[in-house]
Amino acid sequence: METVVSGIRPTGNLHLGNYFGAVQSFVKMQNEYNCLYFIADWHSLTTHPKPENIQSSAKTILAEYLACGIDPQKAPIYVQSDVKQVLELYLYLNMNAYLGELERVTSFKEKARKQPDNVNAGLLTYPSLMAADILVHKADKVPVGKDQEQNMEMARLFARRFNRIYNTEYFKEPESFHFNAKAVKVPGLDGSGKMGKSEGNAIYLCDDEATIKKKVMRAVTDAGPTMLNQVKPEPIENLFTLMQLVSTPDTYDYFNDQYNNMAIRYGDMKKQLAADINAFCAPIRERILEFQSNEELLTKVAREGAEAAAASAEKTIREVREIIGFRN
C-alpha cells in the first residue's frame, strides 16, 4: 500500500475551504492508502507564535480532524515536534541544500516581502524541513495545492541529490497528489478569490449559527440581473457555488431559476444559504466541542500518532545514518 503524508500548520480553525478542498478527501484516502497526517508546529515557528498558542492550536486542529472523520486507527495524526527524527533528516538535507536555490523559492521571496523584519533561516530552509517531513516516511504521494508545487520539486531534488552524493537509490521521489475534480475551490464571502484564514472571508467549521448568518448576510452582492439568463458576476457566482456544496439540488435550482428570470431576492437567498451552511456544520461543530472537552482522548491520539510516526521515521534515520557513514 502506498504511503501518503500531509501536514497542516496550526494557524487557526479549519474552514469550509479546508474541508471541501482537502479534509474531505483525506477522510476517503485513509481507506485507500497508508496515511500519516501531522500538525506542523515547527513550521509555524517562522512567524514566532506565542508559546501558549502553539499547544492549544495543535489541539484545535487535532480535535477538528477527528470531528471531520479522520480515524487515527487508520491514519495516525501526530504533532510534528513529537517526532524528533525529522530534525535529524532536516539537518542532513540542509547539508546538501544550496543558498542560491533556497533564495529563489517563490514562497521564500513572498514571505520575505510580507515580513521584512523577520526573514529568518527557518523561512529560507522551509523546503528542507518540508522535504524531511516527507522523506522520513519515504512517502509515495503528498497532497498539495499549486502553491506548494515548487517545494515538492525541491523535495524531489533533495532526494535525487542525496542518492547521487551517496551513490545509492535509497530515496524515492515523492509524487504530488492533486485532488483535481475531487477537490473543490470554495470561494470567500468578500466577492473574489478563495476562502482563506488570512483573507478574513471564511466560514469556520466551529462557527455557531448566529455567526454563520451574520457572515453570510454580509456577503457581497449587486443590484440584481438586468436581463434574462445574465451571466453571474463573481460575487454572485460565489454564493451559488456555496449553495451547490451545502444545499439540496432543488434549493439550488429554485434560486438559480429566480436569478435567470430576474426575480432573485438576495436577502432570501442568503437566509437560505446561511441555514443550509449551519445544517451542514452543526454535526461537525458538535463533534469538535465533544473532542475538545476530552483532553485525555486528544493526548492519547497525539501520543499514539507520534509513536507510529516515530517508528516509521526511526527506521529511515537508522538507514540514512548508515549510508552517510555514522554509527547507529
Outline where the language-model segments fall:
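N-terminal Rossmann-like or analogous alpha/beta NTP/dinucleotide-binding catalytic cores
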Residues: 2-132, 285, 289
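Conserved nucleotide- and phosphate/pyrophosphate-binding catalytic cores
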Residues: 18, 156-328
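Catalytic-loop motifs flanking and including active-site residues across diverse enzymes
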Residues: 22, 89, 124-127, 151, ...
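Short helix-capping/linker segments at secondary-structure and domain boundaries
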Residues: 99-103, 136-143, 247-255, 285
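Short alpha-helical "patches" and their helix-cap loops
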Residues: 103-114, 143-151, 171-176, 253-264
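Internal, conserved structured core segments that host functional sites
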Residues: 110-162, 166, 187
